[in-house]
A protein has these predicted regions:
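Conserved alpha/beta-domain cores
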Residues: 112, 120-125, 130-140, 144-148, ...
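Conserved catalytic alpha/beta cores of large enzymes that bind or transform nucleotide phosphates
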Residues: 218-318, 323-324, 363-370, 388, ...
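Beta-strand scaffold of nucleotide-dependent catalytic cores
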Residues: 138, 148-150, 159-160, 202-211, ...
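Conserved metal-phosphate-binding beta-hairpin within the catalytic cores
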Residues: 142, 314-339
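Acidic, glycine-rich flexible loop/linker segments
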Residues: 66, 326, 338-343, 347, ...
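Small/polar (Gly/Ser/Thr/Ala-rich) solvent-exposed segments
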Residues: 214, 450, 704
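N-terminal beta-alpha lobe that positions the nucleotide/phosphoryl donor
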Residues: 1-191, 200, 286-297, 302-304, ...
Length: 792
């Protein structure tokens, strides 16, 4: 390539590797590294070239502009937003007005001619790559510019000049000062890369780790129609996919969860080559919003590439990808170290102690809670209105906003997904953010007090008023040994990756009710008899089941995703999934449910559990649950998932439900399947040995056992003070159940509320020889440590 003396001014990507970060910056070095080392492993990266740091430094030196720049920066107060804006604009104009040295212009001309020799109409992406960018402990995400659909040599030259100027964007200047980088020690490289025609297909961002929890056994992929800049900027709410790495490696279906984004707009090529106007934004037709922007096969192919890249770099990675609309081929266009989760941190657990009126909801970023005064900011000119501790509410945050984002107690946006700039910066700053709310700027009013909670799963909520919350920190590397296993009760798959990072020995109770309620929301019979519903109900259901081929597939598919997420999060530890235990009033509350459920005076003691599964009126609904379990265990290979049957009243019912499961293809012992019974009715303990003939063990439900042993309605405030699992009658029944299971060499655990609430009860169960305690996640560490103290 062209030289100036001994140092090249331009280098091809295939000449570069990670040893060249100081010459071409992290972004360009990484592209070169992948082309050189991973192209034989199925990772496709479009070719290109990069100007070097030497070229940039010579450009500043030979023109003398560098002295003016550093003198101006030295006397600028970076924390004064208006002073910073004025200095930044002046510096960028100086750079744009300075001509390139002839040697650099000729070097770019030669490289451009080679890169476009096969297609004179080829379009290019011109990106910045700072020499301090994408170091693992500093996210320079988006602080320099990217220009897309740049065609022709003159347009490329203009774009490179603007990329050089972008080293002195306001946000980049501010970031360097706050991170302790010297302006003189940072240079810029411009990367010129052939464009992938994702304007005709889809593109997005993926991480080889879950960005919220740090769980490293999944790849998290976001995708939307058109050029990827919309996803990166947070201008669009993208589709989201989680892929389980061990299942992928086994060659099985590995997508554990899919969430459809609204994808209202896309960025495409514009007809003009006027600088900065080469792309345009257009609305998406409704039919494309209502389908996923990637097929399942493409999602898995991208995940494989992410795993290859992660294995090569030996660390979690943040990767931008694009699909070519002409060929259908998937390309990697950027890869950098994931910068927030890979730092490691003390475990923090935020808990909200009150519920308020929900004003807005969207995607939760992080797991924290923040509260403060709302400031609705419509454009960057209003930045000076934000005071420390305010809640910043806006349509979407451009990276230019970073200087004020760090002042906020929380951030709320109308648009954006979990991989947009607002999300990346919020994570880095440790500020809770709720993105993609749709209409937060209309619902939230300037000056009102709110609480922003990201501590309740994937969905973040904005509540009216300043609500009470607490935070617990714990740094537990190794837990003491106990004579029993400490497991967890988990219902919400959204929290599974987060909870899996706590000390645990699996899941003793995974409830299907949460999945049915929150991820489906429709009565199974209303879906099976979809054609019989009235037009209004059919429309409601169609809206809920977008992305699925049929009402039946919606129910089975969503159940499969929920169970698979729980199974994958704790794999290979056992995850005991209790099949549905809704009462008739709870089923009636589902969409379309009232038509199919009896009205019962006391649903707690009515049509529920095993009796429902074998009833003619529910058998085909139960078959949907069985189908989901089979997919998770047999197709995906998550055989750590076991099933639990609730509320088995009689031994005859036990026999009938085991026969029904076998009829549905879930036979005890087949493919290692274990079937556990909830021991929660006095008859279960009194006839424990007979019940155990049909099951592989017991899981004690102390809540129902207490209410039925003492004749209490646990939902009645009048008698609630008598409700206590530690009552001698209850303990006598539990002892019988534990002894019977021990005698037969079968598993016995407990998943009721008791051990989470009462450490003395947990200690008594340990003395009785129970195999496991399944606790609420927030009590796991404390109960584990206190039981270890007792054993000393």
């Amino acid at each position: 390539m062209s030289n100036n003396g001994s140092s090249p001014l331009v280098l091809w990507y295939n000449q570069l590797g990670m040893n060249d970060v100081d010459r071409v910056g992290g972004k360009n070095a990484s592209l070169g590294e992948m082309i050189t080392n991973l192209s034989g492993m199925g990772v496709s990266v479009p070719n290109g070239f990069a100007t070097t740091a030497d070229a940039f430094n010579q450009f500043l030196d030979q023109s003398g502009v560098n002295q003016r720049i550093y003198e101006l920066l030295d006397k600028t107060d970076i924390d004064d937003v208006s002073q910073l804006a004025k200095a930044g604009a002046q510096i960028r104009q100086w750079i744009i007005d300075t001509p390139f040295q002839p040697a650099l212009e000729n070097a770019i001309r030669d490289a451009y001619a080679q890169l476009s020799s096969d297609d004179e109409n080829a379009s290019f992406a011109v990106r910045s790559s700072a020499t301090a960018e994408d170091m693992p402990d500093a996210s320079f995400a988006g602080q320099q510019e990217t220009f897309l659909n740049v065609q022709g040599f003159d347009a490329v030259l203009v774009a490179v000049k603007h990329v050089f100027a972008s080293l002195f964007n306001d946000r980049a200047i501010s970031y360097r000062v706050h991170q302790g980088y010297d302006h003189r020690g940072v240079a810029l490289s411009a990367g010129v890369q052939r464009m992938v025609r994702s304007d005709l297909a889809s593109s997005g961002v993926m991480f080889s780790i879950d960005t919220e929890s740090g769980f490293d056994q999944v790849v998290f992929i976001t995708s939307a129609w058109g050029l990827g800049e919309m996803v990166v900027q947070g201008a669009v709410n993208p589709d989201e996919f989680y892929v389980h790495k061990p299942t992928l490696a086994a060659g099985r279906p590995a997508i554990v969860r899919r969430t459809m984004g609204s994808k209202k707009i896309r960025m495409v090529y514009a007809a003009t080559q006027e600088h900065g106007k080469q792309v345009k934004i257009e609305d998406m037709p409704q039919e494309q919003r209502d389908i996923f922007s990637l097929t399942n096969e493409e999602v898995q192919e991208l995940a494989k590439q992410a795993v290859q890249i992660e294995q090569h770099y030996g660390r979690p990675m943040d990767i931008e990808w694009a699909k070519d609309g002409h060929t259908g081929k998937l390309f990697i266009v950027q890869a950098r170290p994931e910068t927030v989760r890979s730092r490691g941190q003390v475990m923090e657990r935020y808990t909200l102690h009150a519920q308020g009126k929900i004003i807005a909801e969207g995607r939760a970023i992080g797991h924290r809670i923040g509260a403060g005064t709302v400031k609705v900011i419509h454009d960057i000119g209003e930045m000076n209105r934000i005071e420390p501790g305010d809640v910043l509410v806006t349509d979407m945050t451009d990276p230019d906003w970073e200087p004020i984002m760090k002042k906020a107690a929380a951030i709320v946006t109308n648009r954006g997904g979990r991989t947009c700039h607002a999300a990346i910066i919020a994570r880095e700053l440790g500020i809770p953010a709720v993105v993609g709310c749709g209409d937060a700027t209309e619902r939230m009013k300037d000056g009102e007090k709110v609480t922003v909670s990201c501590a309740e799963g994937d969905t973040g909520y904005v509540y009216a008023d300043m609500l009470d919350f607490s935070v617990k920190s714990s740094s537990v590397d190794t837990m003491p040994e106990l004579p029993l296993k400490v497991m967890m009760n988990v219902g919400n798959p959204d929290r599974a990756f987060d909870f899996a990072c706590l000390p645990n020995e699996g899941v003793g109770l995974a409830r299907l009710e949460f999945i049915i309620n929150r991820m489906i929301g429709v009565h199974p019979r209303a879906l099976l008899e979809f054609d019989d519903q009235d037009a209004a109900l059919q429309n409601d259901i169609r809206e809920m089941m977008k992305g699925f081929d049929s009402p039946r597939e919606f129910y089975v598919g969503r159940l499969t995703e929920g169970i698979a997420t729980l199974g994958a999060a704790f794999y290979p530890k056992r995850v005991i999934v209790r099949l549905s235990d809704f009462k008739s009033n709870e089923y009636a509350n589902l969409v379309g449910g009232e038509r199919y459920e009896p009205h019962e005076e006391n649903p707690m003691l009515g049509f529920r559990g095993a009796g429902r599964y074998v009833a003619e009126s529910f058998r085909d609904c139960f078959a949907l649950e069985c189908e989901a379990v089979k997919r998770v265990r047999n197709d995906m290979g998550l055989t750590n998932v076991e099933i639990m049957i609730p509320f088995v009243r009689t031994v005859d019912q036990a026999k009938a439900v085991i026969e029904e499961l076998a009829r549905q293809g879930l036979k005890r012992g087949e493919n290692g399947l274990k079937i556990i019974m909830m021991c929660e009715i006095p008859s279960n303990a009194l006839l424990a040995e007979q019940f155990l003939e049909y099951f592989d063990g017991f899981s004690i439900g102390s809540n129902d056992m207490t209410q039925l042993a003492l004749g209490l309605d646990r939902d009645s405030g009048v008698v609630s003070e008598l409700f206590d699992e530690r009552n001698d009658a209850v303990k006598a029944l539990l002892s019988m159940a534990i002894r019977a299971a021990k005698k037969q060499g079968k598993y016995v655990g407990i998943c009721g509320q008791g051990p989470s609430d009462h450490e003395d009860f947990a200690a008594w169960l340990m003395e009785e020889g129970i195999d496991s305690l399944s606790l609420n996640p927030d009590t796991v560490v404390q109960t584990w440590l206190s039981l270890a103290e007792l054993k000393k």
